[in-house]
Amino acid sequence: MSKQEEISKYGAKNIQFLEGLEAVRKRPGMYIGSIGFRGLHHLIWEIVDNSVDEAMAGFATNIEVKLHPNNEIEVIDNGRGMPVDIHPTTKKSAVETILTVLYAGGKFDSTNYKVSGGLHGVGVSVVNALSDSFEVWVKRGGKFYYQKYINGGHPVKPLEVIGEVNKDETGTRIKFHPDYQIMDKVAFDFGTIIDHAKQIAYLNKGLSISCEDITKNTIRNFCFEGGIIDYVSELNRGKKVIIPDIIYAEGTFRDKTPNAQDVIVNVAIQYNETYTSNIVSYANNIQTGEGGTHEQGFYDALTRIYNKYAEDNKLFKNNNEKISREDTKDGLVAIISIKHTDPIFEGQTKGKLENKDARIATNKIISEQLERYMAENPSHAKAIIEKCLLTQRSRLAANAAREASRKKEGSEFGNLPGKLADCSSKNAEVRELFIVEGNSAGGSAKMGRDRATQAILPLRGKIINAEKQDFTSVMSNKEVSSMIHALGTGITDEFNINKLKYHKIVIMTDADVDGAHIATLLLTFFYRYMRPLIEYGFVYIAQPPLYKISTAKVTEYAYNDAQKEEILSKLEDSKNISIQRYKGLGEMDPEQLWETTMNPATRKYCKFKSMTLLAAIQSFQHWWVKKLNLVMTSFKKC
């Protein structure tokens, strides 16, 4: 069957629907997770995912994402174009059916989409429901179609033909503006769009994705012929690798059970000399941050092949020695990407994959190709095994230290660590922990705080660089030990968010480069050992003022040079203007520290979130202070 015949076979009869759109505007969080920053950007990806599905089906090669000056988003692809014929049930065009009926889409019909990132017919209708303006253009069958919707998915008029195109010219173009009567009035962030688009390009080898910020006349183009091999290379940029090769495994597996479907597996692996891991997994281009069966299969393969190789080549010192899953992680950078016809996810956020055959497929395909690689490259194989055994020794030593520390711990709010001055409230939701640079500022913060809800933990020494030190060294650091004890959650695999004692963790450092560096070191530790604190939005960065500007009548604070000049221009007629530049938090008395940096009514904070894993990893590996300073340009009152 020719490609043109396949295109013509995809029509209205392939569009199935399960229920209406009524609930979306009333309960948007059920469909996009939130109405804030994350949910707003999720609207883009629901549209883009449709275009990616066209690419995975073999019909699209190019996707464009455009950010317009009025905060409109436009997504264009060169896929087949939405079906335009009349749907047999709705008696409306297939375009209108897709855009106005929840759970309507071609993704239910496996003859048209072998693989997709979930039920994306849901997504495009939800975007329409949450937009005050939504336009669609379709090129299909030699004609150019257009339809507009307003106020949450109400069509202005039926789909109409507005022109003609070449018969081989196909595709879909969508332009929407969020309905800010429902969504939080937050602007789209071009950096976030770029980061996510780049991930999609890595996962779809050869797919071209461009992102354009029309206001700033900025365009970024992504196309990776190496796919996830290029992804691993990017994540290891600037690091010394254990072996020069990126081990790549790919294949297709089908279980022998009735009605089994193909599972396509792509995995890329490389070790570096650090003590942390970056394992990122995806199912049908959806990042599975909580792992799942494909990650289990990945570790099954690594531990089995590593142990077999070590035993066969007598690399173990005794018969009781075994490499565990935890021992394989230090320095491991891996991308795991599977494509499944019928992915089963845990929960609406699709954070965890549950298909049993994904575990079998990943294990089998990685095992075969990893075993062959190690047999053909014995020096590289030995280096990997030695890295795992070094990790094992560190892990056992750390476990012993952790057990000794555990015996010292008392009740949940008792036996306070270090110089922690705790607050009186026992309600974690209102409790705030200020991690303060220096004893002097820590003393002022203790005197100026709200003792009911604000706890102070001064940093007495330099925080360790968790990116460059092994587990044992990090755990031996007194400042780290104090933070772990104070927060109460544990770390890494033992981390329990339900035991968190403070729902605001505020990093309060000097407003200079040194302060930014200390903040970065703290963020690096949280990211590597207590990552959910960042992912769930519990970590904030305080923004203390740089200047105090006073006259006989008024006192104002400036947080940067531009703000200082703005204040001075307003006071130009005043006499005896006093300008004090704060070199550090310790120069403020308790009242000033409260007024400028700790008072919930006036303080300025940055809520630090890792919007995408790749962006977060890169921000901790490269350009440390520069990256953090960029993050700290957008502040949010708490």
Swiss-Prot record:
Query: What reaction(s) does this enzyme catalyze?
Result: ATP-dependent breakage, passage and rejoining of double-stranded DNA
Binding-site residues, Mg(2+) 2 = 510, 512
Question: What does the entry's cofactor note say about binding and number?
Answer: Binds two Mg(2+) per subunit. The magnesium ions form salt bridges with both the protein and the DNA. Can also accept other divalent metal cations, such as Mn(2+) or Ca(2+).
Per UniProt, residues of the Toprim domain are 431-545
According to UniProt, residues marked as the site described as Interaction with DNA are 462, 465
- Compartment(s) of residence: Cytoplasm
State any single GO MF term: metal ion binding
- The primary location reported for this protein is cytoplasm
Cofactor(s) needed: Mg(2+); Mn(2+); Ca(2+)
Q: Where does Mg(2+) 1 bind?
A: 437, 510
A single GO cellular-component term from the record reads: cytoplasm
GO BP terms, alphabetized: DNA topological change; DNA-templated DNA replication
- UniProt EC number: 5.6.2.2
Q: Which Pfam families would you find in this protein's record?
A: DNA_gyraseB (PF00204), DNA_gyraseB_C (PF00986), HATPase_c (PF02518), Toprim (PF01751)
The protein's superkingdom reads Bacteria
Keywords from the UniProt entry: ATP-binding, Cytoplasm, DNA-binding, Isomerase, Magnesium, Metal-binding, Nucleotide-binding, Topoisomerase
Q: Which CDD domains match?
A: HATPase_GyrB-like (cd16928), TopoII_Trans_DNA_gyrase (cd00822), TOPRIM_TopoIIA_GyrB (cd03366)
Task: Name the job this protein performs.
Answer: A type II topoisomerase that negatively supercoils closed circular double-stranded (ds) DNA in an ATP-dependent manner to modulate DNA topology and maintain chromosomes in an underwound state. Negative supercoiling favors strand separation, and DNA replication, transcription, recombination and repair, all of which involve strand separation. Also able to catalyze the interconversion of other topological isomers of dsDNA rings, including catenanes and knotted rings. Type II topoisomerases break and join 2 DNA strands simultaneously in an ATP-dependent manner.
Quote the PANTHER family the UniProt record gives: DNA GYRASE SUBUNIT B, MITOCHONDRIAL (PTHR45866:SF1), DNA GYRASE/TOPOISOMERASE SUBUNIT B (PTHR45866)
Provide the family line: Belongs to the type II topoisomerase GyrB family.
Give the quaternary structure: Heterotetramer, composed of two GyrA and two GyrB chains. In the heterotetramer, GyrA contains the active site tyrosine that forms a transient covalent intermediate with DNA, while GyrB binds cofactors and catalyzes ATP hydrolysis.
Q: What else is known?
A: Few gyrases are as efficient as E.coli at forming negative supercoils. Not all organisms have 2 type II topoisomerases; in organisms with a single type II topoisomerase this enzyme also has to decatenate newly replicated chromosomes.
Please state what the protein is called: DNA gyrase subunit B
Q: Which organism is it from?
A: Metamycoplasma arthritidis (Mycoplasma arthritidis)
